[in-house]
UniProtKB/Swiss-Prot annotation:
The gene is rplX. Part of the 50S ribosomal subunit. It comes from Corynebacterium efficiens (strain DSM 44549 / YS-314 / AJ 12310 / JCM 11189 / NBRC 100395). One of two assembly initiator proteins, it binds directly to the 5'-end of the 23S rRNA, where it nucleates assembly of the 50S subunit. Belongs to the universal ribosomal protein uL24 family. The lineage of its organism: Bacteria, Bacillati, Actinomycetota, Actinomycetes, Mycobacteriales. GO terms for molecular function: rRNA binding; structural constituent of ribosome. Pfam families: KOW, ribosomal_L24. HAMAP family: Ribosomal_uL24_B (MF_01326_B). Keywords: Ribonucleoprotein, Ribosomal protein, RNA-binding, rRNA-binding. It comes from the Bacteria. This is Large ribosomal subunit protein uL24. One of its GO terms (cellular component) is ribonucleoprotein complex.
Length: 104
């Protein structure tokens, strides 16, 4: 998957289109990412279940995963870009910006 934890992304489709946020978690098997402040849902949590963002239960607002095709990585210039791969001189695979050609 070309989007990793810690990347800044732009949402390009859906109700939160245009929102920017940091990737909290990436789920490669389902091709989904959890973006900070995007796709927020209300979840009813029991008092005994310690969930992400829950103190003592009740109704909790938290982020839900969105599909990786609905986000674009923001490069160092602040522009949304597609991500490609290249092999560097050490034989390691590196992510590169398709817009500028620089390493991400």
């Amino acid at each position: 998957m070309k989007v990793h934890k810690g990347d800044m992304v732009l949402v390009i489709s859906g109700p939160d289109k245009g929102a920017k946020g940091k990737v909290i978690a990436a789920f490669p098997k389902t091709e989904k990412v959890l973006v900070e402040g995007v796709n927020r849902i209300k979840k009813h949590v029991a008092n005994s279940a310690p969930e992400r963002g829950a103190e003592s239960g009740g109704i909790v607002t938290q982020e839900a995963p969105i599909h990786v095709s609905n986000v674009m990585v923001i490069d160092a210039d602040g522009n949304p870009t597609r991500v490609g791969f290249r092999v560097d001189e050490n034989g390691k695979k590196v992510r590169v910006s398709r817009r500028s050609g620089k390493d991400i």
